[in-house]
Amino acid sequence: MITKNIDENLISVIPEDSDDLLNLRRIIKENDKIIGDTTRVLKQDKDYSRPDKGERIKVRIALTVEKISLDDVLDRLRIRGTISESSNESVPHGTHHSFILKINDGITISKKKWLPFEKNLLESSNNQVGFVLVAIDTGDSGIARLRGTHLEFMPNIYSGSGGKRYKTNFNIEKFFEQVQQAISTILKEGDSIVIFGPGETKKRFANFIQKSQNLQKFKVQVVEGIDSGGEDGIYTFTKSNTMKEIMSDSKLAKVSSIIDEVMLLANKKSTKFTMGFDETFNANQMGAVESMVFSDKAIQDDEQKMIDFLNDMENKGVKMYSVDSSTDIGLRVTGLGGIVSLLRYSIES
């Protein structure tokens, strides 16, 4: 999340992914003020004429928040409230309006007092490391950007190579150029590029992009042991031990380790973990939760209840990670009841 502190009450934000939208859902409360650009339909009253359909104009307003909700399917946040200020005198104050906040939209949040955990949520969003994953062979290349635990895919790029059975004038450098251009569109400052796939193509591609002036500032890493290219190669990598080793500081690697530990404890019949909302809620009441992973499914079941629960855990210092169905790990957590946690000590169920 891109943030800018204006003064002690005002902070401007631009969410960069679905994790950021979730954090804003946890931060924005009833009676906060949201300032941003929107559109309103203005109608002109004219005597002796047909009803005016009105003109849609762009206007900057301040909205006093009454209700806020996530729309997980469309990756957006709906903020409802009443208009308290506007840049156009034709927009009446006190009328209801909704902001639809999407990824890369900007707003300013005004609070009478910012709580420490709210500021921490903004700062934690700024510290996430990004990885561009490239699963390449001579036939095609899968490309995805991993930020936090969210995996965003680009369409596969096909080389046009005819394979061993056909004689073609295949130019692999043209294929590499296409893949490089695609990577350049999603790379962000501080990202690393991780390249894998069968055979020697991955090394040849790594050498190719390291000659590019535009990509020289990015760290490039070639990974062995992932023997498939395309989208399948990306999924294979995110489930591998290699991912945990080379991306040990990433959220996905940490979450993967937590899930592995939960499954190990379950096999040992240990009571030092929880699965599902009720078990985790009870453990949190005792202050026993050390780290917790929850899926987007848990939010959808009862949004406000879950938001209150997450904020309570944040205040208790629990390490929390959100996952979604873009990764195999997210699907596993959903299958385990949407929430799993590791405990500081065993508790009786």
UniProtKB/Swiss-Prot annotation:
Coiled coil: none annotated. Its EC number is 3.1.-.-. This is Protein pelota homolog. It holds the Pfam family eRF1_3. The N-terminal domain has the RNA-binding Sm fold. It harbors the endoribonuclease activity. May function in recognizing stalled ribosomes, interact with stem-loop structures in stalled mRNA molecules, and effect endonucleolytic cleavage of the mRNA. May play a role in the release non-functional ribosomes and degradation of damaged mRNAs. Has endoribonuclease activity. GO terms for cellular component: cytoplasm. It comes from Nitrosopumilus maritimus (strain SCM1). The lineage of its organism: Archaea, Nitrososphaerota, Nitrososphaeria, Nitrosopumilales, Nitrosopumilaceae. InterPro entries: eFR1_2_sf, eRF1_1_Pelota, eRF1_3, Pelota/DOM34_N, Pelota_arc, Ribosomal_eL30-like_sf, Transl-rel_pelota. The gene is pelA. It is found in: Cytoplasm. Disulfide bonds: none annotated. GO terms for molecular function: endonuclease activity; metal ion binding. SMART domains: eRF1_1. Keywords: Cytoplasm, Endonuclease, Hydrolase, Metal-binding, Nuclease. Monomer. It comes from the Archaea. Its main location: cytoplasm.
